[in-house]
């Protein structure tokens, strides 16, 4: 059984998600202690518990410690990953519901299902656009298109928007199985082609997305970027607002967002998203700090070496690399001076 220290590095949910994915793929039993020890509320929260149960369901795993707040988990796969039709609902993991991020559940099960025999259809319910996690827009416009270049064939369709704190969102994920993963080279991002944006609200007046869109377009044009922001006004279980920007370079993609909240003007929300995008743009890097650690797992499972240049070597990245190396599947080198990550499979 592989013993994993959940408190290692930044001690967050990434250790758990990576471990679950690799346990499902390899069939290796794992024990994780100190889960999310670095967080204010340690242990499994609703989205982590949903990820545990989703990963367990697809490989018929025996679970010990799968409860809210649990800091110790044993996960013993019972079979190879089974493709199929699944539904996972983050809001059912705790009483009173949850807006836990469904993108994090998606990222836990995507690669196991892509490598399985047969196609899968997964309905995920919970938070689609929430802080401190990838949004479904980021998954759709950045993460999946980059993974597609590595051989992953998957599509996500947004059925309903779910914001913090109510959630109530829903997506459908289609995954083609039997993937052979190839490496990726993202050392040069090339010229910026355009910035695409979505300014979206649910249960709020139409002037709010319009103001977010106008402010973002003005700011990015002042910085001499080509930009177009679409406005969306949708139905939802509760009011919510956000703007999500995707920058398309010749060879790479990145995305940033801003979320509305009480006493924060629509213009300020747009400024938050634009500031993040411009900060990344001026680094000249090919890969944003979030994608940097999300790419480690597919690169580990690929037949060729991968290399990519990151905007920042984050603790998340270093932590994730250390977890992956415990499974003995890949050698990961992080050149902190040049900010270049190299991943070479030890099994192919």
Curated annotation (Swiss-Prot):
Catalyzes the conversion of 3'-phosphate to a 2',3'-cyclic phosphodiester at the end of RNA. The mechanism of action of the enzyme occurs in 3 steps: (A) adenylation of the enzyme by ATP; (B) transfer of adenylate to an RNA-N3'P to produce RNA-N3'PP5'A; (C) and attack of the adjacent 2'-hydroxyl on the 3'-phosphorus in the diester linkage to produce the cyclic end product. The biological role of this enzyme is unknown but it is likely to function in some aspects of cellular RNA processing. GO terms for cellular component: cytoplasm. ATP binds at residues 107, 290-294. The keyword Ligase applies. This is RNA 3'-terminal phosphate cyclase. Its EC number is 6.5.1.4. Keywords: ATP-binding, Cytoplasm, Ligase, Nucleotide-binding. GO terms for biological process: RNA processing. It comes from Nostoc punctiforme (strain ATCC 29133 / PCC 73102). It is found in: Cytoplasm. Signal peptide: none annotated.
């Amino acid at each position: 059984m592989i013993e994993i220290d959940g408190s290692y590095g930044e001690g967050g949910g990434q250790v758990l998600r990576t471990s679950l994915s690799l346990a499902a793929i390899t069939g290796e039993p794992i024990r994780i202690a100190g889960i999310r020890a670095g967080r204010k509320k340690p242990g499994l929260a609703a989205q982590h518990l949903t990820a545990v149960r989703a990963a367990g369901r697809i490989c018929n795993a025996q679970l010990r410690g799968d409860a809210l707040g649990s800091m110790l988990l044993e996960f013993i796969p019972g079979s190879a990953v089974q493709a199929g039709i699944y539904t996972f609902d983050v809001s059912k993991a705790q009483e009173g519901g949850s807006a836990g991020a469904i993108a994090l559940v998606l990222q836990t099960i995507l690669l196991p299902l892509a490598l399985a025999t047969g196609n899968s259809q997964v309905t995920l319910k919970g938070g689609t656009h929430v802080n401190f996690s990838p949004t479904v827009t980021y998954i759709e416009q950045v993460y999946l298109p980059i993974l597609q270049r590595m051989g992953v064939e998957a599509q996500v369709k947004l059925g309903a928007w779910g914001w913090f704190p109510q959630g109530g969102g829903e997506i459908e994920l289609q995954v083609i199985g039997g993937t052979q993963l190839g490496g990726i080279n993202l050392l040069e991002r090339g010229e910026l082609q355009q910035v695409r944006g979505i300014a979206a609200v649910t249960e709020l007046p139409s002037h709010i997305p319009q103001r977010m869109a106008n402010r973002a377009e003005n700011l990015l044009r002042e910085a001499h970027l080509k930009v177009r922001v679409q406005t969306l006004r949708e139905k939802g279980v509760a009011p919510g607002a956000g703007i999500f920007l995707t920058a398309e370079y010749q060879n790479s993609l990145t995305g940033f967002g801003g979320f509305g909240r009480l006493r924060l003007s629509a213009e300020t929300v747009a400024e938050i998203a634009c500031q993040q995008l411009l900060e990344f743009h001026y680094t000249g890097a090919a890969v944003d700090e979030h994608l940097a650690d999300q790419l480690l797992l597919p690169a580990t499972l690929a037949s060729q070496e991968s290399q990519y240049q990151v905007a920042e070597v984050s603790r998340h990245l270093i932590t994730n690399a250390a977890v992956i190396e415990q499974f003995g599947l890949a050698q990961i080198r992080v050149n902190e001076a040049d900010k270049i990550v190299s991943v070479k499979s030890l099994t192919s």
